[in-house]
A protein has these predicted regions:
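Bacterial N-terminal signal peptides that target proteins for export
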Residues: 2-10
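Hydrophobic helical h-region of N-terminal Sec-dependent signal peptides
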Residues: 11-16, 318
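A short, hydrophobic C-terminal helix/tail in secreted or cell-surface proteins
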Residues: 305-324
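Disulfide-rich extracellular domains of secreted proteins
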Residues: 25-303
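N-terminal signal peptide c-region/cleavage motif recognized by signal peptidases
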Residues: 19-21
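Membrane-interface capping segments at transmembrane-helix boundaries
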Residues: 326-328
């Protein structure tokens, strides 16, 4: 990497870091860089009992697994719980409640279920694994399962998990790379999966990628296991068995699973995704990214460090001066 390129990258990282200090509601939770894959799935039912699944290849090893529950009218999460594969779930992380003017105290919660899932998958035959799931509160609107696995046969990639709640005025996520992207390279991929709760009836959110609006229809209750929709099954998750959403899909076409490749250009060093809760009546509580290469999620890419906020301005000015001297 030449010095001009490195200075530009560090300056960009500083600006991204500063921008990231602005309040956001959908924030990075975990990032995995290496030979990783990810599976996502959703489920919802007013019966409060069903099946949620994961796709894991043979020979892979479970690194982490997280179970989310989306709720309504219960910001304290009173009585929220359940089981996964017959074991009790401790939902110990409240991901926050969407403030007014959004309705209904929309709140999601997360549990680490690695210790439950790992023994059931590691050393198994590979393929689709099904897990029994239950809920304990009528305020629970469904669940999402995110499973990250390592597989030495895979190339280097980045898995980023963000969670929280959907700001009415929008959230921006940046995936930042140390080298320019080449979307035309064989095997290049960039995938995004959203988890959205309390959504139906044309309630929708919007998604932009590097300034291109790719959907105004993110939402619906695609993972409802019941014959009809009702509070208690209004959830959709971009799942491993969903087709990728087409560009600007209709409400029924949007699967909340997206390939971002067509919205990238050769030479891009970041992927910027903006989600907006336009309806003020549903909750993007989770976003999962899986992209080729090494990336930082709302932070500089691996190997690039930035100073503490108190020294950002002086450091940036020094780098600008050095760059001008090199160009003169």
């Amino acid at each position: 990497m030449n010095i001009n390129r490195k200075i530009t990258l560090i300056l960009s990282a500083i600006l991204l870091f500063a921008a990231g200090t602005v309040q956001a509601a959908l924030i990075p939770f975990q990032t995995f860089v290496g030979n990783y894959g990810v599976s996502t799935d959703g489920w919802g039912s007013t019966t409060q009992s069903g099946t949620i699944s994961a796709l894991v290849p043979a020979g892979a090893t479970v690194v982490a697994a997280y179970l989310y529950s989306s709720t309504f009218n219960n910001s304290s999460l009173a009585g929220v719980g359940g089981t996964l594969a017959g074991q009790s779930i401790n939902y110990d992380t409240n991901l926050g409640t969407i403030p007014a003017p959004a309705c209904c105290e929309l709140t999601a919660t997360r549990a680490d279920v690695t210790s439950i899932i790992k023994p059931l998958v590691d050393g198994g035959p590979g393929g689709v694994y099904n897990f029994d799931i239950t809920e304990t509160s009528s305020s629970q609107d469904g669940s999402a399962l995110v499973l990250v696995y390592s597989d030495p046969t895979l190339g280097i990639s980045t898995v980023g998990i963000l969670d929280g709640y959907a700001r009415v005025d929008g959230d921006t996520t940046s995936l930042n790379f140390s080298e320019p992207l080449d979307p035309s390279a064989p095997g290049f991929f960039a995938h995004m999966m959203l988890g959205i709760g309390f959504s139906c009836c044309n309630q929708a959110s919007t998604v932009e990628v590097n300034g291109t609006l790719i959907t105004e229809s993110a939402g619906n209750n695609n993972d409802n296991a019941d014959a009809s929709l009702s509070n208690g099954n209004l959830i959709t998750v971009g799942s491993f068995d969903d087709a990728f959403s087409p560009f600007m899909p209709g409400y029924e076409e949007d699967t909340e699973r997206y390939s971002l490749v067509d919205y990238l250009s050769a030479g891009d060093s970041s992927i910027s995704i903006r989600t907006t809760n336009a309806s003020e009546d549903d909750n993007i509580f989770m976003a999962v990214f899986h992209v080729s290469g090494e990336a930082g999620v709302n932070e500089p890419p691996p190997g690039v460090t930035i100073p503490e906020p108190a020294t950002l301005t002086l450091f940036a000015l020094a780098l600008f001066g050095l760059r001008r001297r090199l160009q003169s």
